[in-house]
A protein has these predicted regions:
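Assembly/oligomerization scaffold segments
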Residues: 1-106, 280
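Short, well-ordered loop/turn sites that connect or cap secondary structure elements
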Residues: 57-59, 291-292, 416
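Short, Lys/Arg- and Gly-enriched loop/turn segments at beta-strand edges
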Residues: 70-76, 305-320, 429-439
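Short, solvent-exposed secondary-structure boundary/capping segments
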Residues: 81-96, 327-340, 372-378, 433, ...
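Extended, domain-scale alpha-helical bundle/helix-rich regions
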Residues: 85-86, 149-155, 160-342
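Charged- and aromatic-enriched interaction segments used to assemble
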Residues: 95-193, 241, 255-260, 371-394
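Structural signature for extended repeat/solenoid scaffolds and their inter-repeat hinge/linker regions
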Residues: 298, 360-589, 593-597, 603-604
Length: 665
């Protein structure tokens, strides 16, 4: 039953209402408070009106409700109606919300870097001119926080859900985070200050297993809910434990909070289960005390008469109010109804807010200088302005990872360049967990694949390229200095270097040429061999040079079936001792003069005689042979052990195989 409580006053804007017909205020945690006010036409301007032209000035104005000249509710007027029924003049119905409604902006996108959630909430409340009592438990700075297609108020509610923060409007200000000190308890007793009281228990506890992945540490993490009644009073603990056997299977869920350590995950699942089971033990009651509001703490007592002069009283504990309805009638009769949960709870019930589902976004790369050298990039999405940007995000690749032999960068490593346009995806649809799906050409950067889409290419920012041409079936690799490898698709390869080419082989190197080999050197050629040079030529070796010098430190041996030493000018053979041997015949010829000269003694010996003639034999000079090229094709014999021997082939019309032993002089 309501009782008169005369000192109730209402002000809209600068207008104080002299009277009103009724007032109702609905309050709950994690949501706007809503009010409905009914006033007569005199209070709204003029009773003899056909419209609401006078009272329309109240739209958008603040409304303040006072009890005993002390404000207990502040709101904003959002709706006015002229209501008529029957033959009376009617009334004005005024409705609206708590001042938090100023944060009910149109769905918006915004982002912050290196800020705590408390910093973000403080900034948004300042923008909405909403008083704030801030004491967020999560104080770490986050590298990236993103509001995505949400009003400012829904975004704050979502932060409270993700980070398990207390959030409620107490009638005058928004409370974010559990207050450092809860309000002093107000004693409420059934039978005196409470006209009705209901006490309830419900089975809300369910086992869960929460998983997440930390890419920086390459670590999969998961934790089960503790399934213990932390923060619950005795009755709630009994109901908590009674509920668990009904759900033997733990639900698997991803962590909606970005966590970086196993301790963070353990704390998250602890508070998550505490919030989901906060209303396990609850009370609902009615009172006439206008001091109560959402967030008030009450010391609840139950009492009744056991007999004349015998009052039985029992403390039910301290409770915190989470839902409340205030009602004031025309004669200032006041009453309220509320729902409360034990004051020992670790978390309030979760705000009823949906997690946003981020869609693919186009973005521009701002930096690829990952401070950790992990190949990540920072990008700016189209809606991000000023200094807004993502944190360092990973880049999708067709193949990437590590292996036993390759610890990092195994696979395709193609990091977008600054200024590139990329497409972003989002893990679990979370706008704070973007990754690069790939790059996009646009009207100024794309050139297509040529006619018939025949060109496939890979090009770096400096001009290094790999070009595959399906028209002529060719492949070309170029660097920025002009060096190239060209495979023309017809079996030919062209290797070109404007400067130098070096070939290094740690062990062996084989060069196989099926037909001709031509080597052109513009200046000089040097060949250094550590042990032995072995050259096997099937037909001829021809050397053409203006000057030739051979330096042999120890032994020089030339062996041939026939040998010709020919000079157009002069041949000199000089040695401390020189032997010229013809096993059957030795013939020394000069077309003009032959001189045998010795500064010592000349000896001529013939075992069968010595003859002298004054008539010379005729001598036909060998015809000089000239050629321009030589082709060599050889390989080692199968039983080669270092001696002079080969398996060799002549590919003309037939093939013959023969082993030649050159070890005998």
């Amino acid at each position: 039953m309501a009782i008169p409580f005369n000192p109730i006053s209402i002000t809209i804007g600068k207008d104080g209402l002299s009277s009103f017909k009724s007032l109702r205020i609905d309050q709950s945690t994690g949501a706007h408070h809503h009010f409905d006010l009914t006033v007569d036409l005199e209070s709204g301007g003029n009773r003899q009106v056909h419209n609401i032209s006078s009272s329309k000035e109240w739209l958008g104005k603040d409304i303040i409700v006072k009890a005993a000249n002390k404000p207990f509710f502040c709101g904003i007027v959002t709706n006015i109606e002229l209501h008529r029924d029957g033959s009376d003049f009617g009334c004005i119905q005024v409705s609206g919300y708590s001042t938090t409604y100023r944060m009910e902006t149109a769905p918006s996108c915004y982002s912050w870097n290196d800020r705590s959630i408390g910093d973000v909430v403080k900034s948004l409340c300042s923008d909405g001119k909403v008083q704030l009592a801030l004491n967020a438990a999560h104080k770490k700075q986050l590298d990236y926080i993103c509001q995505y297609e949400e009003s400012d108020f829904d975004f704050v509610r979502r932060l409270a859900l993700q980070y398990q923060e207390w959030m409620y409007y107490d009638g005058l200000k928004l409370v974010f985070g559990k207050p450092r000190r809860l309000p002093d308890p107000i004693k409420m007793e059934f039978g005196t200050s409470l006209s009705s009281l209901n006490i309830g228990l419900q089975t809300l506890a369910r086992p869960e297993q929460v998983f997440t992945f930390h890419s920086g540490a390459n670590r999969e993490m998961d934790r089960k809910t503790p399934d213990k009644a932390y923060g619950h009073d005795r009755m709630a603990g009994d109901a908590f434990r009674a509920a668990l056997p009904s759900y033997p299977k733990a639900a698997r869920q991803y962590s909606i909070q970005r966590v970086s350590s196993i301790n963070d995950l353990e704390n998250y699942v602890l508070l998550k289960q505490a919030a989901e089971t906060a209303e396990t033990h609850y009370v609902t009651a009615e009172s006439q005390d206008p001091r109560l509001h959402v967030g008030s703490v009450i010391s609840l007592y139950s009492s009744f008469l056991k007999g004349v002069g015998n009052l039985s009283q029992e403390s039910l504990g301290d409770f915190i109010i989470i839902e409340m309805t205030h009602e004031v009638s025309e004669s200032c009769y006041y009453k309220n109804r509320f729902k409360a949960i034990p004051g020992t709870v670790m978390s309030l019930p979760n705000p009823k807010v949906e997690m946003p589902l981020a869609e693919t976004q186009m973005a521009t790369v701002l930096s690829n200088a990952d401070p950790h050298g992990a190949g990540r990039v920072q990008v700016r999405m189209n809606w991000q302005t000023d200094n807004m940007r993502t944190s360092w995000v990973r880049v999708m690749t067709p193949d990437g990872g590590g292996s036993k032999d390759v610890k990092s960068n195994r696979g395709f490593v193609f990091i977008p360049e600054v200024g590139d346009q990329v497409l972003l995806g989002f893990r679990h649809g979370d706008p704070a967990r973007p990754y690069v799906m790939g790059s996009l050409f646009n009207g100024t950067t794309g050139n297509g694949g040529g006619s018939n889409n025949s060109i496939k290419s890979l090009k770096t920012r400096s001009g290094i390229s790999v070009i595959l041409n399906d028209d002529n079936k060719s492949l070309e690799i170029k660097d920025a200095g002009g060096s190239s490898i060209h495979l023309d698709g017809n079996g030919n390869i062209l290797l070109n270097a404007p400067k130098n080419i070096q070939l290094h082989a740690g062990n062996d190197m084989s060069l196989m040429v099926g037909h001709d080999l031509q080597v052109n050197v513009g200046n000089s050629q040097t060949t250094n061999i550590g042990n032995m040079l072995l050259t096997n030529v099937m037909q001829k070796i021809l050397v053409n040079t203006p000057f030739m010098q051979q330096l042999v430190a120890d032994f020089f041996h030339t062996q041939a079936g026939k040998a010709l030493l020919n000079s157009q000018n002069q041949i000199k053979i000089e040695a401390p001792e020189t032997n010229v041997v013809g096993e059957q015949r030795l013939f020394i010829h000069s077309a003009e003069k032959a001189i045998f000269n010795s500064q010592g003694i000349i000896e001529m010996r013939g075992e069968q005689g010595t003859n002298e003639f004054n008539q010379a034999f005729s001598y036909q000079k060998a015809v000089e042979e000239k050629a321009k090229r030589c082709v060599v094709y050889f390989k080692r014999s199968e039983n080669y052990n270092g001696e002079y021997g080969f398996d060799w082939f002549i590919w003309v019309r037939t093939c013959r195989k023969e082993t030649i032993n050159l070890s005998t002089p």
